[in-house]
Amino acid sequence: MAGLPHSPHAVVTGAARGIGREIAATLTRAGAVVTALGRQNAALEELIARGDARFSAVADVTDQAAVVAALKEAAARRPIDIMIANAGAAESAPFAKSDAALFKRMLDVNFMGVVNSIQAALPSMRKQPFGRIVVIASTAGLKGYPYVSAYAAAKHAAIGLVRSLALELASTRITVNAVCPGFTDTDLVAGSIDTIKKRTGRDHAEAMAELTRHNPQGRLVSPQEVSDAVLWLCGEGASAVTGQAIAVAGGEI
């Protein structure tokens, strides 16, 4: 299987924890030069100290000006070849109680954060002979789940962006894809389990079962399984794969 080209520069947003941290480490092990972007400088520096990233960039993906400045600095160090738009957040509420502020928060980070990251990276990427854009979406971008209508709407929007941008860039050497994890063993899902316990009175095992029942394999996905899918999409062997939303969810989708 064809791997990464020689030492590409990859920017990973939301790299301080969870799936983003695993993606940064996986790409680094595969030979990429990784810039880890996030809001928490201490966590990013820890990533670098472990050897799982080369550079850090502090920015909130919802702040367009901050993202542009951070990626301009990153591109000055080394032109950008790979953009992994991973940063995201989830909140749950019944639709009737999902106010405009909740929808705006979910769209700002899960959709506009993706837009801001890609737009800031593209000027550098267009000058390169190789390019990969991978958006970390969710199975919630491919189907519905109750009580997360704002989150699901934002993830559906992100996948729509991927499909449209892939066609727009098809004549270039830049591919655009989404990876859509099911419920994954991260802090974000741990928070969801705590929420289920508080709202329903269920114990940990029962709350976990509420999530794993969606996965035909009866388990949570691991961050490494998600990062392995990302690594494949970033490789030269995936040059003909673009505009796809690939579920990593044990057969749920």
Where in this protein do the model-derived segments appear?
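Substrate-binding pocket helix/loop in short-chain dehydrogenase/reductase
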Residues: 94-95, 99-107, 211
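Conserved glycine-rich cofactor-binding loop
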Residues: 16-17
